[in-house]
Curated annotation (Swiss-Prot):
It comes from Caenorhabditis elegans. This is Transcription factor aptf-4. Transmembrane segments: none annotated. Belongs to the AP-2 family. One of its GO terms (molecular function) is DNA-binding transcription activator activity, RNA polymerase II-specific. It is found in: Nucleus. Binds DNA as a dimer. Sequence-specific DNA-binding protein that interacts with enhancer elements to regulate transcription of selected genes. Required for neuroblast and epidermal morphogenesis, perhaps acting in cooperation with transcription factor aptf-2. One of its GO terms (cellular component) is nucleus. Keywords: Developmental protein, DNA-binding, Nucleus, Transcription, Transcription regulation.
């Protein structure tokens, strides 16, 4: 009984291994789909034709193997080895085909030879050639043919002991025989591009491989001439301070970023971005800027994601991030949040040792996140771009592009605030371990507004703390200005 019931062998000719490989490598120009079946004869005897088995589409797992090295595609559904239909629709490479052991077996002349097939020998997801294992031990697994298991008792194949008795070959011999040598020192391996570790985070930008090298692929866009810092227009800000009118420079580089991914601004959005009305003079002005600097706006760019950041220029967005950072540093109640966090941990039946361990581990995690973001700088107006050559670059730069440069400094500001809270909570925990008590706090009545139940002593302490913080900052600024002048 055949191991491959769907493999038709009535019309197969395995007279020699070379002829079989010739048929595989150079299939007949007339495909099975172009041949017509002869009409049935009147007496009911139909013409005998090779049976064509319908093939179902397989999973899209494309792995090409060179046919001249003995590879064939293995069809998992019909359990056959062939590549005559590899270029037809619905056919493809399925899995890893077993290697053809050309070095181990030599066909005896003058005898019918069935091509040797090793049952899934070394069937891994890496690309191999028949010569990969030529210096190792002889193949000891059972050999199979498409018809039946005949190779264990067949005398058609004789081991080539001149090859197999030489022992394991050295690396120099393996590199000579291997048609696909692996260069372990090369930086072109795919996983190197997406390797996220401390060494790659701290390496210089000159060592970044090709796809992420900013000299080759700046800001994941089309390389252009050095006109990026040219001011295309001076426009008013969207969030001017009270009593002032802020103006910001719209550079050519920023205009290219707005017209590219992920926003793809169309001309209607650019009119708002330029703070221009849709009058003829304003329309011509915007079109002239786009034409002068060779910026293409596709007519299909109609469906885009509009956010509150869409009308902001990058200078204004980063100024907003700086103001938010200074407000957070001044008014965020770090001590009160840290005290609340520690009380919650103790309330959940955690002793001080466990609380301190949790807080220190959390601090390490936040520190790692901050370092990961600090070594990067998405391209915005007035900032030099920094890429690190892994998978975070593209997604994080898209985040920065969508927020017009606001996302990166704002994220760093938030994580640094979280770190201060955790560090202060750990400091309170260490003081409690030494016998100190937690600072007292005043509890508000539910539904009562802040400051309504605040005592006079606490209010004075709160105001004095703010005053001392402001005085220290002014003194620091004065010392820095004095040192620069001297």
């Amino acid at each position: 009984m055949s191991y491959y019931p769907y493999y038709q062998t009535e019309n197969s000719d395995y007279s020699s291994f070379n002829s079989l490989m010739a048929d595989i490598c150079e299939p007949s120009p007339s495909s099975s789909s172009s041949r017509k079946r002869p009409a049935d004869s009147e007496n009911g005897n139909s013409a005998k034709m090779p049976v064509v088995i319908p093939m179902q589409p397989v999973q899209n797992f494309t792995m090409q193997y060179p046919i001249d090295n003995g590879w064939q595609n293995f069809n998992m559904i019909h359990q056959v080895y062939n590549n005559n239909n590899m270029n037809q629709p619905g056919y493809g490479w399925v899995g890893q085909p077993p290697p053809m052991p050309q070095d181990f077996y030599k066909a005896r002349p003058g005898q019918t030879v069935t091509p040797p097939m090793n049952e899934f020998h070394n069937a891994h997801g890496t690309q191999q050639t028949p010569n990969d294992n030529s210096g190792n031990l002889p193949i000891s697994s059972v050999m199979y043919t498409p018809e039946s298991d005949l190779s264990t008792t067949s005398a058609n194949f004789t081991p080539d002991w001149n090859t197999t008795t030489n022992g394991p070959c050295n690396q120099e011999k393996r590199n000579k025989e291997n048609l696909f040598p692996n260069d372990d020192t090369s930086s072109g391996k795919l996983f190197d591009y997406f390797l996220t570790n401390t060494e790659r985070e701290n390496e210089s930008e000159n060592n970044i491989p090709h796809p992420y090298n900013k000299a080759v692929f700046p800001t994941f866009g089309v390389p252009v001439s050095s006109d990026g810092n040219v001011v295309a227009e001076v426009v008013d800000g969207r969030l001017p301070a009270v009593g002032t009118r802020s103006k910001y420079d719209l550079t050519v580089d920023e205009l290219r970023r707005r017209c590219g991914a992920p926003e793809h601004m169309n001309q209607s959005a650019l009119y708002c971005f330029f703070r221009k009305s849709k009058k003829k003079e304003a329309i011509n002005r915007v079109k002239k800027v786009l034409t002068d600097y060779n910026i293409t706006v596709r007519t299909m760019q109609r469906q885009r994601k509009v956010t509150c950041f869409s009308p902001f220029l990058e200078e204004e967005a980063t100024a907003l991030a700086r103001d938010l950072d200074s407000i957070t540093e001044e008014f965020l109640p770090i001590d009160a949040i840290a005290l609340e966090m520690l009380e919650k941990l103790i309330f959940n039946n955690k002793n001080l040792d466990i609380c301190l361990r949790i807080l220190k581990n959390t601090n390490k995690t936040i520190t790692r996140v901050i370092k990961t973001l600090e070594v990067r700088q998405p391209k915005i107006t007035g900032q030099k771009e920094k890429l690190k050559g892994n998978s975070l670059d593209l997604s994080y730069h898209n985040f920065s592009l969508t927020t017009h440069g606001f996302g990166h400094p704002n994220s760093l500001s938030h994580y640094r605030s979280y770190q201060k809270i955790v560090e202060q909570a750990a400091l309170y925990c260490e003081k409690m371990q030494k016998g100190a008590s937690l600072p007292s706090k005043e509890y508000l009545i539910p539904g009562q507004k802040p400051f309504e139940n605040m005592s006079n002593e606490f209010f004075v302490e709160w105001r004095m703390r703010s005053y001392h913080k402001k005085a220290r900052k002014e003194m620091l600024d004065f010392n820095q200005a004095y040192s620069r002048s001297s």
